[in-house]
Amino acid sequence: MWPQVIPGSKSITNRALILAALAAGPSTIHGVLRSRDTDLMADALRSMGVTITEEAPDRYHVEPPAELSSGSIDCGLAGTVMRFVPPVAAFADGPVHFDGDEQARIRPMTSILDALRTLGVRVENNRLPFTVTSDGIPEGGVVEIDASASSQFVSGLLLSAPRFVNGVTVRHIGGRLPSMPHIEMTVAMLREVGIRVDVTPNQWTVHPGEIRGHTWRIEPDLSNATPFLAAAAVTRGTVTVRNWPRDTTQPGDSIRSILEDMGCTVEFISNGATFDLEVTGPAELKGIHLDMSDIGELTPTVAALAALATTESRLTGIAHLRGHETNRLEALTAEINRLGGNCTELDDGLHITPAPLHGGVWHSYADHRMATAGAIIGLVIKDVGVEDIQTTSKTFPGFETLWEEMVG
């Protein structure tokens, strides 16, 4: 049995940083994930005058300024920085310039930038690089967007909405909205700092109000935990993850039911005031038919499991993954098939049929979740080498070390 403490949630860390930057008073964030994505978020807010002090490696003290300032922001390849920070820039006293990695310049941005224009903010360009300029505090109001490419468009507007004079109502008018749990996370965190949010199907109204300074305690990143639990599933071993929350808005929590459906034994183990999650792999790993529209970020982990299962799998509802760090559907299909697998790309997902795999190079495409998917397969299939495993530092610095400790 291999127990492990997983670092804090990227999604919660970056939302807490935004709310702390916009708050009326200081905040403290415990359990901060330190990764490229979260460091980019902290640096983006610092560039607009927010004081973020590292009190410990995983603890920040955040002091918002009297007024946000103009600046230049490096988004890297962090979707949360690209989509959460432009609405914050609407409250700066001058232009805020955004740019990022070359790959980031092709990621969809039009929905949130057009929304800002509707709310009275000036935006130059429709993709990175772009500049956000506001003439005073924007009024806010009702905005209709197509967020079918990413729920981050909705969350980005909601997080800053309390600072708009009239608040903001966001209406989603496109196709099926992916990753609803991430929007639910945003709403829950807004309410935690005293903001009123009304929710109806495909519509969110955030009322204007003062965001309270807050002490945040960040849960472990459950999506980052999934490769380790998958390791138990494919090796018939047992893995324990410490401090798994019993009640959470994180999409990664869905891995519990997924692993059970694929034949694993999944149990909560009481550990004093907290709980650990223990997973034991089955003698025979079964395939799965799964609508993953709400949990798209788990697709690389589940696809790796499916490639090693004894029955076929069908993963659907994930057409939006074509717009992630890489086209994940195309990449997963290419890499599974490169190792002898049988993966077919569907209009909105993947169909994976059992096939004997062999060694080879698994390409990561500079995508952290692609890299961890290759690591899962490499536990079982001899001579699989993951190209650029270091890309996992985007959300999980030290992944390689923990993985090697687990493998022993």
Curated annotation (Swiss-Prot):
It is an enzyme of class 2 (transferase). This is 3-phosphoshikimate 1-carboxyvinyltransferase. Its main location: cytoplasm. One of its GO terms (cellular component) is cytoplasm. Phosphoenolpyruvate binds at residues 10, 79, 107, 152, 328, 369, 394. GO terms for molecular function: 3-phosphoshikimate 1-carboxyvinyltransferase activity. The gene is aroA. Pfam families: EPSP_synthase. The active site is at residue 297. Signal peptide: none annotated. It catalyses: 3-phosphoshikimate + phosphoenolpyruvate = 5-O-(1-carboxyvinyl)-3-phosphoshikimate + phosphate. Its EC number is 2.5.1.19. PROSITE patterns: EPSP_SYNTHASE_1, EPSP_SYNTHASE_2. One of its GO terms (biological process) is chorismate biosynthetic process. Monomer.
